[in-house]
């Protein structure tokens, strides 16, 4: 029987859908990660970080999970914690969407909001402070550096893309939050399956820290509206050596593209999904990518952004 022991085991096997209004002659397909158990790509890493912590004895019954989140990883950790019987405290910048905050509280999270201007660095610092207050009680899973993050994408997301495209994938486009998706998928296809695809990282034009780092420039993070990517620093889980190209997208374009995905493709897409598709659409129309199969990761669905600029001016 196909019955899961708990909801954490139901991750993955999300569909690929060909876009009709983006790209060149149907060469852009999207992997809809909002079909995961708590409705985002982060379900994969939430489950695997908890599983691995249990396996290595770091996380045992009676201990409490702590981490910093911009929302989706927190929701993923929270659903896994609820399913497996753990208490959980999460820190999050106060600027994240109302939906994310309410979902976290609904899942039983002790939610600690941090100053929005300090971004994810501020949330991480607060999480570390909480853990330091009682190290025997708290376990911090550290999504930005935990190897279980890219590992699950190497074991699941990458092989799914390979299988569902019959190995014909040429380009993978993904926004960078923790760096786990693009790193794990690229390692799977390039190293395990042996195909030298083009790995494209997407970041906000307002906070182009990956581009600045690769160019040897001073890193100058900035505020933007693309929740879930552009943390303002280079995460340890981002393997820069496996990235072939970096594309920047501004917040307004990301928002407009996410709205187009809903209205023109019937795909409920969040803001970072809009950024990734905008980057892929731009690439797909270049001569060198015209005949390439481009797979884009759509991290989450639009319901998580009802109170944000994504739905500004849209009334029922």
From Swiss-Prot:
Record-level GO BP terms: cysteine biosynthetic process from serine
Catalytic activity: O-acetyl-L-serine + hydrogen sulfide = L-cysteine + acetate
Subunit structure: Homodimer.
CDD domains, per the entry: CBS_like
InterPro entries (alphabetical): Cys_synth, Cys_Synth/Cystath_Beta-Synth, CysK, P-phosphate_BS, TrpB-like_PALP, TrpB-like_PALP_sf
Gene3D superfamilies on file: 3.40.50.1100
EC category name: transferase
Family: Belongs to the cysteine synthase/cystathionine beta-synthase family.
EC number, as in UniProt: 2.5.1.47
Essential cofactor(s): pyridoxal 5'-phosphate
Encoding gene, per UniProt annotation: cysK
Any one GO molecular function term: L-cysteine desulfhydrase activity
Protein name: Cysteine synthase
Pathway the protein contributes to: Amino-acid biosynthesis; L-cysteine biosynthesis; L-cysteine from L-serine: step 2/2
UniProt-annotated binding residues for pyridoxal 5'-phosphate: 72, 177-181, 272
Database matches in NCBIfam families: cysK, cysKM
Binding site for hydrogen sulfide: 7, 35, 268
Organism phylogeny: Bacteria, Pseudomonadati, Pseudomonadota, Gammaproteobacteria, Pasteurellales
GO CC terms of this entry: cytoplasm
The organism's place on the tree of life at top rank: Bacteria
N6-(pyridoxal phosphate)lysine modification, residue list: 42
